[in-house]
Amino acid sequence: MMSKLRVLLTICLLLFPLSALPLDGDQPADQPAKRMWNGKLAARKPRFDKYDLVRGCCPPQWCGPDCTSPCCG
């Protein structure tokens, strides 16, 4: 009985070697925090026109109700 089991195990290992299985160490590290930060950074990055930089204006979404800048008008 043990010899039959040994033969079966040998055949299975020859047909499907353990090296074919992906190991955790072989996979690139998943970095969801970095992907999220890049997305948030891109979404929060202010988009200035050259004209706005010369005038010293900020983006309209930065203007609050008590803003005294001529750009917030």
UniProtKB/Swiss-Prot annotation:
Q: Which GO terms describe its molecular function?
A: ion channel inhibitor activity; toxin activity
Q: Which residues carry this modification: 4-hydroxyproline?
A: P59, P60, P65, P70
Keywords, A to Z?
A: Amidation, Disulfide bond, Hydroxylation, Secreted, Signal, Toxin
Which superkingdom heads the taxonomic lineage of this protein's source?
Eukaryota
Q: Give the record's PTM text.
A: Contains 3 disulfide bonds.
Q: Which InterPro entries match?
A: Conotoxin
Propeptide residues according to the Swiss-Prot or TrEMBL record: 21-55
Q: In which tissues is it expressed?
A: Expressed by the venom duct.
Q: Where in the cell is it found?
A: Secreted
Q: What is its main location?
A: secreted
Residues annotated with Cysteine amide modification? C72
A Pfam family of the record is Conotoxin
| Signal peptide (residue range) | 1-20
Q: Which GO terms describe its cellular component?
A: extracellular region
The written remark on domains in the entry is:
The cysteine framework is III (CC-C-C-CC).
Write out the similarity annotation: Belongs to the conotoxin M superfamily.
Give the protein's recorded name.
Answer: Conotoxin reg3a
